[in-house]
A protein has these predicted regions:
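Surface-exposed peri-terminal alpha-helical interaction modules
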Residues: 1-216
Length: 216
């Protein structure tokens, strides 16, 4: 192979040939719609990976009280979530009858087995050690590590406290592996953020927008 052939280009930088080889239908034929099914779910997994990457970045920026960076990163999270939601529009072009032409070949495979989705749930605050029980050990370990680490909300509370909006110490020091429990003092602190006109209010708005997106 010549140096020119080895030079970085679009195809080898993105590993396009390898990427396009990863859609592997299991149905005989194969069934036409199975490729769409595989592609959509693989794309979801890529977006889950990116969301985890961005949320980790937002948490680092919150720790450093870099408000403008936090806003930019949370906005990206929000936009990616919107893309994930719109992607459903493509999936629903497949009718139940079309799906049933290959569903039996999938055996027990299910979207509920997505380890990255469980990681995403954990980093966004879900605290349930049972939801990783059915995963393979290596995937279960990753989910359990997320459950035991500060969630995005935990990072946000520490950020608000660093911005001099008083968050009770026992909440900042709580066991983050346990579910967050509503506290009126935190609500009061968030209301004070909004009343103050501080840019932290924009961060709170981004977090609300993300929560709304997750409910769609």
């Amino acid at each position: 192979m010549t140096d020119q052939q080895r030079a970085l280009n679009y195809m080898n930088y993105l590993a396009v040939d390898e990427l396009l080889s990863l859609q592997r239908p299991v149905s005989d034929g194969p069934e036409h719609d199975e490729l769409l099914f595989i592609t959509i779910h693989q794309v979801y997994e890529l977006w889950f990976k990116q969301l985890l990457h961005e949320i980790e970045q937002a948490q680092r920026e919150m720790d450093a009280v870099r408000t403008q960076d936090v806003l930019a990163t949370l906005n990206r999270v929000k936009v990616i979530l919107a893309v994930c939601i719109r992607q459903v529009d493509v999936l629903v072009t497949m009718t139940p009858l079309q799906f049933n032409t290959f569903r039996d070949r999938l055996e027990s495979a299910s979207g509920f087995q997505s380890a990255q989705f469980r990681e995403l749930e954990a980093v966004l605050g879900r605290r349930d050690h049972r939801f990783a029980a059915h995963l393979l050990p290596e995937h279960r370990a990753k989910v359990e590590a997320r459950v035991s680490a500060p969630s995005l909300w935990d990072s946000a509370l520490a950020y608000l406290n660093a911005c001099e909006f008083s968050i009770p110490e026992e909440i900042l020091d709580r066991d983050v592996a346990q579910p967050y429990k509503h506290d009126d003092r935190v609500t009061a602190a968030v209301l004070e953020v909004y009343r103050s006109g501080h840019q932290a209010a924009l961060v709170c708005e981004q977090l609300v927008d993300i929560e709304v997106s997750l409910r769609e």
